[in-house]
């Protein structure tokens, strides 16, 4: 859905019909700004005072300048609206935290990955053998669904869909009282 929304945004951005609509609106605005209501006293003063006549060319230049200023302000406000809509349209990423207690909980975790949600998995409530099986199942599913599984703690893993980038620093996990028993290497015991 995110790809479809992005494509629709790109198409709507380059759509020529919308651009002409905005230009028509911009051309109408200076006309509204230039009109002023005159009170009866102002109307009476006009015949008494000689008006300064501005050559038609200067009037045309002034209207062009005003139109250009309106178009610039419109384009600035449009770019601000586009930036704001891009920020609002960006989907918020939800991270689900799961503490699986049995092997069957792995299916629920994979379903979250299918729905493009990030999952933080903590195996602290599982026995080592069950945790290995569960981790193996989740790792296989993440490969099929083009997800990413990263170890973030001694018993914690972060499962993310393909569109989420995780920038994690390499930290030395303490191997003092807990040996890294939950690892991809299934042969080590």
Curated annotation (Swiss-Prot):
Main localization of the protein described in the UniProt heading: cytoplasm
Keywords (A to Z) from UniProt: Cell cycle, Cell division, Cytoplasm, Septation
One Gene Ontology cellular component: cytoplasm
InterPro entries from the UniProt entry: Cell_div_SepF, Cell_div_SepF/SepF-rel, SepF-like_sf
Subcellular location: Cytoplasm
Region listing for Disordered, in residue ranges: 18-64
Subunit structure: Homodimer. Interacts with FtsZ.
Family: Belongs to the SepF family.
Function: Cell division protein that is part of the divisome complex and is recruited early to the Z-ring. Probably stimulates Z-ring formation, perhaps through the cross-linking of FtsZ protofilaments. Its function overlaps with FtsA.
Name of the protein described by the UniProt record: Cell division protein SepF
Organism: Streptococcus thermophilus (strain ATCC BAA-250 / LMG 18311)
Organism lineage: Bacteria, Bacillati, Bacillota, Bacilli, Lactobacillales
């Amino acid at each position: 859905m995110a790809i479809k929304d992005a494509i629709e945004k790109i198409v709507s951005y380059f759509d020529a019909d919308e651009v002409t609509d905005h230009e028509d609106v911009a051309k109408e605005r200076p006309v509204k700004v230039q009109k002023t209501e005159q009170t009866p006293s102002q109307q009476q003063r006009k015949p008494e005072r000689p008006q300064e006549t501005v050559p038609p060319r200067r009037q045309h230049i002034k209207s062009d300048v005003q139109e250009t200023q309106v178009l610039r302000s419109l384009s600035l406000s449009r770019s601000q609206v586009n930036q704001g809509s891009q920020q609002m349209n960006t989907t918020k990423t939800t991270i689900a935290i799961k503490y699986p207690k049995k092997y069957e909980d792995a299916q629920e975790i994979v379903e979250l990955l299918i729905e493009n949600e990030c999952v933080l998995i903590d195996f602290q409530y599982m026995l080592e053998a069950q945790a290995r099986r569960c981790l193996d199942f989740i790792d296989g599913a993440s490969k099929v669904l083009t997800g990413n599984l990263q170890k973030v703690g001694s018993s914690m893993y972060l499962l993310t869909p393909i569109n989420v980038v995780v920038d994690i620093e390499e930290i030395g996990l303490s191997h003092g009282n807990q040996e890294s028993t939950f690892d991809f290497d299934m042969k080590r015991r």
